[in-house]
Swiss-Prot record:
Result, substituting residue 205 to F: In allele rym4
Main location: nucleus
Bias (Acidic residues): 16-27
Reported modifications of this chain: According to the redox status, the Cys-113-Cys-151 disulfide bridge may have a role in regulating protein function by affecting its ability to bind capped mRNA.
GO MF term list: RNA 7-methylguanosine cap binding; RNA binding; translation initiation factor activity
Keywords: Cytoplasm, Disulfide bond, Host-virus interaction, Initiation factor, Nucleus, Plant defense, Protein biosynthesis, RNA-binding, Translation regulation
Assembly: EIF4F is a multi-subunit complex, the composition of which varies with external and internal environmental conditions. It is composed of at least EIF4A, EIF4E and EIF4G. EIF4E is also known to interact with other partners. In higher plants two isoforms of EIF4F have been identified, named isoform EIF4F and isoform EIF(iso)4F. Isoform EIF4F has subunits p220 and p26, whereas isoform EIF(iso)4F has subunits p82 and p28. (Microbial infection) Interacts with potyvirus viral genome-linked protein (VPg); this interaction is possible in susceptible hosts but impaired in resistant plants.
Phenotype upon changing residue 57 to F: In alleles 40 and 44. In allele rym4
Pfam families according to UniProt: IF4E
Protein encoded by which gene: eIF4E
Upper lineage: Eukaryota, Viridiplantae, Streptophyta, Embryophyta, Tracheophyta
Gene Ontology terms describing biological process: defense response to virus; regulation of translation; translational initiation
Disulfide bonds: 113-151
Name of the protein: Eukaryotic translation initiation factor 4E-1
Example of a GO cellular component annotation carried by this entry: cytoplasm
């Protein structure tokens, strides 16, 4: 009841939290309760990851510089995070943002990603912001008919171009992959052809793997 919430004391451990530690919002405070009532839950929880290998030795193993930023599960949490991090056009060359379903790591070695592949869209420098945002909204809003096949999305900033990619689970499921590719182009109003590369093919090829599917 409201009376109980208002009279409940603040968390006893507030003074004991280490610097930088996020307070637990489950303490029953009126503000937290109000936030939970008004929040709009997403069908899946998602985690933002950041990879900035700049300044790292080339000998560092691929994927070792990727680290999670924050996991969100409501519309409000998404916008709070998105509005407080750099957009892709502001990132250093070589950096990547990843947004993957919670518990899935944005790595080929992750068991859920291992048999999958990715659709990729390339664009000019500074042009990826809109594509990235619209891709995120389509993902967290569950706009894809084969949404269960999707692992997450990546935006990559490189010297001469920027790329946005959608990673999927099962490259052999041609029906699902073609549907995802076509719908993604529709959501972004993207007119050029895009290709789907299987992760296993990419790992075996030093010069770039051929597209398994094209839409």
């Amino acid at each position: 009841m409201a009376e109980d919430t208002e009279t409940r004391p603040a968390s006893a451990g507030a003074e004991e939290r280490e610097e930088g530690e996020i307070a637990d919002d489950g303490d029953g405070s009126a503000a937290a309760a109000a936030g939970r009532v008004s929040a709009h839950p997403l069908e899946n929880a998602w985690t933002f990851w950041f990879d900035n290998p700049q300044g790292k030795s080339r000998a560092v193993a691929w994927g070792s510089t990727i680290h999670p930023i924050h996991t969100f599960s409501t519309v409000e949490d998404f916008w709070s995070l998105y509005n407080n991090i750099h957009h892709p056009s502001k990132l250093n060359v070589g950096a990547d943002f990843h947004c993957f379903k919670d518990k899935i790591e944005p790595k080929w070695e992750d068991p859920i990603c291992a048999n999958g592949g990715k659709w990729t869209i390339s664009c000019g420098k500074g042009k990826s912001d809109t594509f990235w945002l619209h891709t995120l909204l389509a993902l967290i809003g569950e706009q894809f008919d084969f949404g269960d096949e999707i692992c997450g999305a990546v935006v990559s900033v490189r010297k001469n171009q920027e790329r946005v990619a959608i990673w999927t689970k099962n490259a052999a499921n041609e029906t699902a992959q073609i549907s995802i590719g076509k719908q993604w182009k529709e959501f972004l109003d993207y007119k050029d052809s895009i290709g789907f590369v299987v992760h296993e093919d990419a790992k075996r090829s030093d010069k770039g793997a051929k597209n398994r599917y094209t839409v």
